[in-house]
Amino acid sequence: MHSRKICVSLGQPTMPQALEASLRIFGADVIEVRLDYIDVPEIDPFVESLATDLLFTCRPTWEGGLFAGTEEDRLALLAEAVRAGAAYIDLELRSAEESHQYLRTYLAERETELILSYHDFESTATLAKLTGIIDQMQDAGADIGKLITTANSAADVVRVFQVLEYAAKKGLPLIAFCMGEAGAVSRVASCDLGGYMTYCCADGAEVTAAGQITISEMRGIFARYP
């Protein structure tokens, strides 16, 4: 049984633009608010305006994002998202241990789920390394793992699919697919191979990651291949 859960990522640079874009999204199961893209990010306007489950991400520059502020300020935004009732927050696996401890403490007895994420913007590592990353995510207390690599060949995509199987055996819900043109198929197929969720961009919006497709395109593919 596949989930085919779709998350639409918002990448607008201002609060008014991001809010307006979020209200025009139809058919998404989750909306990801990229706080690192917004010039003066706020949490409450999204929570108050949207009934869709919200995922808040504040990706630092060292993991391919735009946030260049202090770790204290970044964690404060994520903690505020938890307080406001976010369904998910995304924290990088490679964040400092102190950051992990802070958010684990803040998440205690709250319903927000923690996604621990890992991104490789150049390649896809060996299967042994990738499964080791899954072990690290589970050991670090992830509710959901997120493993995103860059595919330079079909073999890279196959390895990521093997990681989905490994995570399922470990009991860790996992988001896993490949960026890049060679990995575009994985964004669709991962949902049918045990992936927890896939990511799209809104119709008419700029992509927030290489190889990303729009939600209408994704829904169309799912409809053709039920």
Swiss-Prot record:
Q: What InterPro entries does the entry give?
A: 3-dehydroquinate_DH_AS, Aldolase_TIM, DHquinase_I, Type-I_3-dehydroquinase
> GO MF terms on file?
3-dehydroquinate dehydratase activity
Catalytic residues (positions): 119, 146
Give me the residues that bind 3-dehydroquinate, please. Answer: 9, 32-34, 59, 187, 208, 212
Q: Which reaction does it catalyse?
A: 3-dehydroquinate = 3-dehydroshikimate + H2O
Top-rank lineage group of the source organism: Bacteria
Identify the metabolic or biological route this protein is part of. Answer: Metabolic intermediate biosynthesis; chorismate biosynthesis; chorismate from D-erythrose 4-phosphate and phosphoenolpyruvate: step 3/7
Q: Which Pfam family would be a valid example here?
A: DHquinase_I
Return the SUPFAM superfamilies for the record. Aldolase
Give an example GO biological process: 3,4-dihydroxybenzoate biosynthetic process
- Which Enzyme Commission numbers does its entry carry? 4.2.1.10
Q: Which UniProt keywords apply?
A: Amino-acid biosynthesis, Aromatic amino acid biosynthesis, Lyase, Schiff base
> Which positions are tagged coiled coil?
none
**Which PANTHER family does this chain map to?**
3-DEHYDROQUINATE DEHYDRATASE
Record's subunit section: Homodimer.
Function, as annotated, reads: Involved in the third step of the chorismate pathway, which leads to the biosynthesis of aromatic amino acids. Catalyzes the cis-dehydration of 3-dehydroquinate (DHQ) and introduces the first double bond of the aromatic ring to yield 3-dehydroshikimate.
Family as reported in the entry's similarity comment: Belongs to the type-I 3-dehydroquinase family.
| Entry protein name | 3-dehydroquinate dehydratase
Source species of the chain? Desulfotalea psychrophila (strain LSv54 / DSM 12343)
Organism phylogeny? Bacteria, Pseudomonadati, Thermodesulfobacteriota, Desulfobulbia, Desulfobulbales
Tell me what gene encodes this: aroD
